[in-house]
Amino acid sequence: MNFKISSPAKINLGLKVLNKRKDNFHNIKTIFQFLDWGDKIYIENEVSETEIICKEIENEKNIIFKLFRILKKEINFEEKLKIHIDKKIPTQSGLGGASSNAASVLLALNKIYNLRLSKKKLLEIGLLLGSDVPIFIHGKSCEATGRGEIFKNIVLEEKPILIILPDSKISTLEAFKKNKNFDPQSLNEKNFFNSFETWARKNFEEVNKCFEWIEQHNDAYLSGTGSTIYSLFNNFDEASKIMDNAPSKMNCFVTTTLNNSKILNEIKNYGV
C-alpha cells in the first residue's frame, strides 16, 4: 500500500535561551506555530528492502534511518519500507525540516501498523531524535520550555506570513556554541524576541541584507537559530504585494500560520 503524508514546517515566534543545562543542552522558551507549507512524504510498504529517497540529503545522514534504529531497539520494529521525501524545507533554515520528517513518519507508522505507542512514548522517542521533533508530534500551537519539549497549548491568530529563505545555512549546534551573549529580553505573544537574531545578522551578511530589506516594509523576525526570516501580516494582499517587490534573487513566498499540524487529521484513518 502507498501512503502520502504532510511534513509541515514550524515557525518560532521568538526564541529565548534561558541557561545551559548539565546535559549540555539549553533551556529555552519559545512559541510554536505551524506553516501551511512543507515537505511531502510517500510511504510504500510491502517492499523487499528499506529505502529512503531524498535527493537533498545523503542516505546515511537522513534522520529517518536514525528513527528506524530507535524503533528496532525500542519495539523491535523491522518492517521494510520505501520512503520518498519531496523536500521543500531547506536544511539548517530554522523551520524544522528533518525533525518534521521524523515526526511525520513516526506518527504515520504508529497508525499504519497499529503500534499502539502512547503520546508519551512517541514524545520520548522524538526527543531521542532531536529537540525539535516533539513539537511535530504534539502538533498544536504552544508555548514550549525545557529543551522545547514541555508544552502549554495556546491558540494564536492564524495569519498570512511572508517567509524569506536566505542561502545561508546556520547549524543549530554551531549557533549555540558560538553565540554566548544571550540577551535577557522577555518573550511573549506580542514580543517575538530571538536570542540569535543579533548574532545571525552580524555573522551572516545575506541574513542581514534580507532583514534590512523587509524592515523597510514591516516588522521581521528570525525563526529558531535561523536562517529563515519571517514577517506577519493582517491580509494576503499586503503580504503578496511586498513579496512581488522583493529583490529578484531573494527566495521568498507567502503562506499561512496554522495552530494545528495537518498530519494529525491525515493519519486518522490509516492502517493495514
Annotate each language-model stretch with its function:
Residues 226-229:
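Conserved glycine-rich beta-strand-loop-beta hairpin in the small C-terminal domain of fold type I
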